[in-house]
């Protein structure tokens, strides 16, 4: 290959990525039973964590004539690892062990064809489902908190990606996108995470007995302001290898989601917000089905799905605002350094309505966050925050704590976190 051809090929290649390293200290119990009997865990010791929430590498290539390729490989929580060892204590038997928890995912892999200078595009492959703010803007420089915003990341898949077909484009100050996807799987829905795990598959393929559609429209007409409206609809029941009996013929598990989000970046302020609402039909019947069929055979274990109650609806809303105080210091402004002081409030509930709502009051969470984001250069941000997660107080109607009818309030959950992130293009 000639030198000129090599340079041309290299100019068509794009490499980038992002990553997060986090240290946190949680000043509340880490017991999985802390919501069942909160009085037993009120004085538990704090606990700390080190984590690599996301480390991603992006690769793209422009083939010419409007054809492009994009891919993203994501290592969640440092990836995973297994090893085979010979155990002396077990007569030299081979033993496979999980050396490290985590995940490795192909989060994106798509081919795109552009028409009419980007006014219309066709994209096919593993694509991001653009529902809500956090699925579209999931890089660490697009939110202030150390971890991704809790609300949307809890009630929906995040980052939500599936194999599908997308029609999208830009028209002046508008961007649109419509997608055809496989439906989610209601066997993976839970009380505490709603449909968060519904997009995953334990098999080597994604079952697509049901299909779903996603739509998003964005507007950029006002300088510094972006507004997005997105929606999703699809059936979720029977989207698995298992075939339910005829008594379930009328169930569809229809899932509808609507989300509104915005971001404002001007005058040294960044303000972001979102409102998300989801409704799930046949929640009671599918909850009963999941619990009655949590394993294929009474002597068989290892079912990858869940068998908890499911809410009929879920909700999440949030607002965050940050001001760049270095904008008022000439030397820092000239060096393009930034220091944002921010605050965030959010509420989310994975069991906002439904027959079992009273059993899962702890799913109704509120959270206040205050912190700093310091960027010495554009691609690197150091984050620090104090987070306070809390719950609605029980109405005990004047009962004292020694009464057998007294309902113990849930313990508040404060924490501090420190993180360092990078996000940018390398080539």
Residue ranges and their predicted role:
Residues 1-12:
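Sec-dependent signal peptide cleavage junction
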Residues 10-27, 45-186, 209, 213-214, ...:
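Outer membrane beta-barrel
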Residues 28-30, 42-44, 94-99, 109, ...:
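Outer-membrane beta-barrel pore domains
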Residues 31-36, 166:
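Short Gly/aromatic-enriched secondary-structure transition segments
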Residues 38-40, 144-151, 295-296:
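Surface-exposed loop/turn segments flanking beta-strands in extracellular/periplasmic regions
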Residues 97-98, 152-154, 200-204, 305-307:
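Active-site rim elements
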Residues 158, 204-211, 250-254:
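Active-site glycine- and acidic-residue-rich loops that bind
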Residues 188, 194-240:
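Loop-centered beta-sheet repeat module
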């Amino acid at each position: 290959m000639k030198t000129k051809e090599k340079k041309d090929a290299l100019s068509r290649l794009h490499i980038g990525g992002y990553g997060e390293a986090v240290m946190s200290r949680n000043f509340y119990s880490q017991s999985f039973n802390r919501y069942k009997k909160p009085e037993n865990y009120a004085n538990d010791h704090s606990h700390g964590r080190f984590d690599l929430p996301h480390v991603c590498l992006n690769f793209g290539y422009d083939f010419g004539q409007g054809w492009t390729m994009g891919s993203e490989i994501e290592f969640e929580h440092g990836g995973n690892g297994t090893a085979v060892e010979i155990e002396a204590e077990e007569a030299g038997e081979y033993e496979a062990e999980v050396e490290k928890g985590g995940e490795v995912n192909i989060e994106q892999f798509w081919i795109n064809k552009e028409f009419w200078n980007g006014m219309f595009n066709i994209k096919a492959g593993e694509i991001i489902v653009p529902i809500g703010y956090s699925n579209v803007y999931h890089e660490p420089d697009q939110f202030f908190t150390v971890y991704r915003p809790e609300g949307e990341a809890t009630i929906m898949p995040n980052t939500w990606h599936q194999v599908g077909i997308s029609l999208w484009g830009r028209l002046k100050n508008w961007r649109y996108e419509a997608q055809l996807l496989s439906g989610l799987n209601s066997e993976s829905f839970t009380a505490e995470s709603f449909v968060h795990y519904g997009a995953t598959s334990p098999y080597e393929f994604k079952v697509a007995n049901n299909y779903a559609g996603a739509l998003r429209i964005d507007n950029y007409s006002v300088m510094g302001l972006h507004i997005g409206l997105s929606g999703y609809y699809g059936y979720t029941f029977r989207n698995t290898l298992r075939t339910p009996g005829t008594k379930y013929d009328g169930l569809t598990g229809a899932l509808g989601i609507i989300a509104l989000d915005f971001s404002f970046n001007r005058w040294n302020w960044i303000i972001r917000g979102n409102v998300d609402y989801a409704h799930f039909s046949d929640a009671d019947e599918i909850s009963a089905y999941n619990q009655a069929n949590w394993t294929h055979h009474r002597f068989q274990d290892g079912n990858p799905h869940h068998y908890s109650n499911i809410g009929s609806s879920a909700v999440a809303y949030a607002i965050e605002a940050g001001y760049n105080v270095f904008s008022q210091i000439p030397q820092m402004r000239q060096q393009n350094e930034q220091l944002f002081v921010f605050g965030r409030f959010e509420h989310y509930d994975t069991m906002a309505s439904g027959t079992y709502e009273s059993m899962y009051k702890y799913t109704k969470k509120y959270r206040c966050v205050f912190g700093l984001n310091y960027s010495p250069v554009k691609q690197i941000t150091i984050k620090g925050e104090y987070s306070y997660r809390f719950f609605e107080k029980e109405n005990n109607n004047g009962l004292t704590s020694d009464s057998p009818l007294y309902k113990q309030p849930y313990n508040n959950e404060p924490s501090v976190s420190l993180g360092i992130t990078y996000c940018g293009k390398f080539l």
